[in-house]
Amino acid sequence: MSIAMRLKVMSFLQYFIWGSWLVTLGSYMINTLHFTGANVGMVYSSKGIAAIIMPGIMGIIADKWLRAERAYMLCHLVCAGVLFYAASVTNPDMMFWVMLVNAMAFMPTIALSNSVSYSCLAQAGLDPVTAFPPIRVFGTVGFIVAMWAVSLLHLELSSLQLYIASGASLLLSAYALTLPKIPVAEKKATTSLASKLGLDAFVLFKNPRMAIFFLFAMMLGAVLQITNVFGNPFLHDFARNPEFADSFVVKYPSILLSVSQMAEVGFILTIPFFLKRFGIKTVMLMSMVAWTLRFGFFAYGDPSTTGFILLLLSMIVYGCAFDFFNISGSVFVEQEVDSSIRASAQGLFMTMVNGVGAWVGSILSGMAVDYFSVDGVKDWQTIWLVFAGYALFLAVIFFFGFKYNHDPEKIKHRAVTH
């Protein structure tokens, strides 16, 4: 089996695990375990907390002491055990702590999977800019397959979804043992204090361009959290209108939302072209504009024929909004940093997006939703327009604040030699 195909299998399983429970665990906790909304919010907050703490630390470990593929294997082994136990938990406080441990083991694997992929591609003499996006496509496919499998097997309200995730984690942990060895960075004769402490990636903040990049990564991470948290409740709220109570949107909101992940597959494949043709600045600007459209279409969408088309368009542009930021950003970090701190830098990127950004996004977006709610009834149109305005504001500031001169040949050369 070629290295590209082996990495595709890894990517598929990586996101299959997440797709097995991420979308449906909330419904299981509310409907089966009878947790309150606050309980569910507390459990899901574990993702942001873990993402702040763990990816950078695990990246440093993978750079300095433990081979990346071994760190990856150990993390998924922990996830397998924790998810298996989580299936038997019925207390909300215990569920928070159990899922926090799971998140602390799982969140670093996102960055580690990127680092392992880039290193394996480099060892094989392949161009990461061209070879990585098709590999990542299989991650999205894995997420969709898991989500639909749980839905079609009617396990949305069952603890069996956690057993499925546990089994997939155990399988991926074993599979990681078959991956090529990723060498730990050689220690230099003269090292800085930051290097001795394993804080190399944090030195990137001394570079104004990288500092601005990570700042916007955090702010766009907040945008991603908005749609993760409030997309499904928004669609469910159409049930308040008798005209839409029996509509497809109300009955199968998760299936409609899964179109967003499907759109990712197509947009991922366009990343090599857009990155080489236009560069990271234009690609990230396109992402911010896509987020503006995502929220704008939500503002005017509903289950009517015309409104459904707008909702569907919102799902489609999500593919561009998500991929052109997350995947392109990861490739940009890969190209801009020294290979000795690659895993640390990828971990820092994930920390800013899924940690700080997710935490800030949860708090501020929740405040915005409450502000535009009266007696429990949410003014969704105004809420989505506010979020659209935020995304558009980011695009304008990024256009003037991020300095980047695109050189297609330089990008190609650096991608091959890293």
Regions found by a protein language model. Give the residues of each.
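A membrane-interface helix-boundary motif in multi-pass transporters
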Residues: 152-168, 367-391
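Cytoplasmic helix-loop-helix junction between adjacent transmembrane helices
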Residues: 100-138
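Juxtamembrane intracellular "pre-TM" segments in multi-pass secondary transporters
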Residues: 1, 180-215, 240-245
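Helix-loop boundary and gating motifs at the non-cytosolic
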Residues: 1-48, 209-245, 252, 326
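Hydrophobic core of transmembrane alpha-helices in multi-pass small-molecule transporters
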Residues: 12, 82, 92-112, 116, ...
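Cytoplasmic membrane-interface "Motif A"-like loop-to-helix N-cap segments
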Residues: 63-76, 276-288
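Multi-pass alpha-helical transporter architecture, strongest
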Residues: 6, 85-89, 169-181, 355, ...
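C-terminal ends and interior cores of transmembrane alpha-helices
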Residues: 77-91, 289-304
